């Protein structure tokens, strides 16, 4: 895929993004994000924000777009394009959003934000008030024989997370100004995604899709943690981020894929270097890495994937080191009256192609929504750590060689409850606590049982039917 002219991709996507921004500048009047059957007269009447003339003027293709908001098949789930990159979640997974029609365009808006205070024990722990957040405008329409989707994703974390980090005990793999970030997670870039997607149906059960992104998420790993339904109530990152989904913000991404019934195969080319510490700009780089992903969706409530990638020079501190990454995940979602239960299991492995050293991570997370306004969740992790943690936030010594050291465990449990809402914005107050299991080599630094506590306010864009 490296033969595709990089400059042309950038120009095309910038034009697409500008068009999407202009369209999304119109004031939306939200409609239901989950119509049961957009083709029925009853369902048409149940879509607020759309006039009778709008509904009667909708063609079959536009009605199909409406049906994709409540997908019944893997093909519809893919064309929904509500997760990160081109990843898929179970068909039954809820997707809070605002949505409206503007001429031939369906306009959507997703957003999730936390304002939280975190406090951690141990001499390496930290205390901080900060905000993690993202928002995603989308526009879809029929174009030629297929469907065009324009999508942007943005974060204000460069402003709401100061000093290049927020406290996260045992986190590693991050870098700022030539120094490792130890026990902290860096903010996301302001530009998380600028992408155009095009899908073509080839018969009733087959779909061809393409994805072009100045900044985006290649076909590697599960849905990235900020956008994963099972992690939606958890305000902080995962310890296994660099083994599982750290490529979710990559530069110059090109993905092609084919779906047949319940099976999908994809391949991506992208620039392997992770974003630098300059969080407001758009990084550049040639396509030098590749990945492939197999997705299987054996029913409404299940989704699984296996993926493999070769990544060129991802880490700024080790520019001569290329990496191999493998991930596998299984996601389950079960809707029920006044609630929903969603769970994800993830395995990730990163192997250095210089010395064949490996780091594995394992994650199990689950979120239960019950009695409409209540959420309880857990995240259990077992993550490999390297000797870089022993150095802390200091320049690496001359001749330093990174090597696997031990595993750490993180056990997180949380609860929040939604309270009075203003139109199209759900608010919740919550807290979570994390207890850590520490490998013997790290106990002299961290102690044997450090803990962390977070108290937060969560804000989310919703339609009235998401309540």
Regions from the language model: what does each represent?
Residues 109-111, 150-152, 210-212, 256, ...:
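Membrane-embedded beta-strand positions of outer-membrane beta-barrel proteins
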Residues 139-143, 200, 257-260, 296-298, ...:
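Residue-level signature of outer-membrane beta-barrel architecture
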Residues 260, 264-268, 295-400, 411:
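Detector for outer-membrane/organellar transmembrane beta-barrel domains
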Residues 105, 127-135, 188-194, 248-254, ...:
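Residues that define the transmembrane beta-barrel architecture of outer-membrane proteins
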Residues 161-295:
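Surface-exposed coil loops of outer-membrane beta-barrel proteins
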Residues 107, 144-149, 204-208, 262-266, ...:
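Repeated loop/turn-to-beta-strand initiation elements of outer-membrane beta-barrel proteins
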Residues 113-119, 154-160, 214-218, 260-262, ...:
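Transmembrane beta-strands of outer-membrane beta-barrel pores
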Residues 413, 447-467:
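Outer-membrane beta-barrel "beta-signal"
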């Amino acid at each position: 895929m490296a033969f595709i002219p990089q400059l042309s991709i950038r120009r095309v996507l910038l034009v697409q993004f500008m068009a999407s921004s202009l369209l999304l500048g119109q004031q939306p009047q939200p409609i239901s994000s989950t119509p049961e059957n957009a083709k029925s007269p009853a369902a048409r009447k149940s879509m607020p924000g759309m006039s009778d003339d709008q509904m009667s003027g909708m063609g079959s293709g536009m009605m199909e777009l409406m049906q994709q908001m409540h997908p019944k098949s893997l093909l519809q789930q893919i064309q929904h394009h509500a997760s990160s990159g081109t990843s898929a979640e179970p068909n039954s997974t809820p997707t809070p959003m605002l949505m409206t029609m503007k001429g031939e365009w369906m306009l959507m808006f997703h957003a999730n934000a936390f304002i939280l205070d975190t406090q951690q024990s141990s001499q390496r722990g930290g205390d901080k008030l900060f905000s993690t957040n993202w928002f995603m405008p989308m526009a879809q329409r029929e174009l030629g024989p297929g469907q065009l989707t324009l999508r942007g994703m943005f974060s204000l974390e460069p402003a709401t997370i100061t000093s290049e980090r927020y406290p996260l005990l045992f986190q590693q793999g991050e870098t700022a100004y030539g120094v490792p970030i130890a026990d902290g997670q860096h903010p996301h870039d302001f530009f998380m995604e600028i992408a155009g997607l095009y899908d073509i149906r080839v018969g009733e059960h087959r779909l061809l899709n393409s994805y072009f992104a100045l900044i985006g998420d290649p076909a590697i790993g599960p849905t990235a943690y900020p956008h994963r339904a099972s992690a939606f109530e958890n305000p902080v990152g995962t310890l296994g981020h660099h083994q599982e989904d750290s490529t979710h913000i990559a530069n110059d991404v090109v993905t092609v894929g084919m779906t047949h019934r319940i099976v999908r195969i994809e391949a991506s080319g992208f620039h392997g270097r992770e974003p630098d510490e300059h969080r407001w700009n758009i990084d550049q780089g040639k396509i030098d890495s590749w990945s492939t992903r197999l997705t299987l969706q054996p029913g409404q409530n299940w989704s699984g994937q296996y993926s493999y990638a070769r990544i060129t020079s991802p880490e700024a501190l080790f520019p001569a080191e290329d990496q191999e990454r493998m991930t596998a995940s299984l996601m389950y979602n079960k809707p029920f009256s006044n609630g929903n239960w969603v769970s994800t299991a993830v395995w990730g492995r990163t192997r250095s192609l210089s010395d064949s050293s490996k780091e594995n991570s394992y994650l199990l997370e689950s979120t239960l929504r019950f009695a409409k306004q209540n959420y309880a969740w857990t995240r259990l992790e077992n993550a490999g750590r390297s000797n870089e943690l022993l150095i802390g936030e200091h320049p690496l010594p001359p001749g330093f060689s990174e090597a696997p050291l031990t595993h750490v465990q993180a056990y997180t449990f949380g609860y929040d409850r939604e309270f009075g809402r203003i139109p199209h914005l759900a608010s919740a107050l919550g807290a979570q606590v994390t207890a850590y299991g520490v490998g013997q080599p790290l106990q002299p630094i961290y102690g044997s049982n450090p803990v962390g506590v977070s108290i937060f306010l969560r804000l989310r864009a919703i339609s009235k039917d998401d309540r």
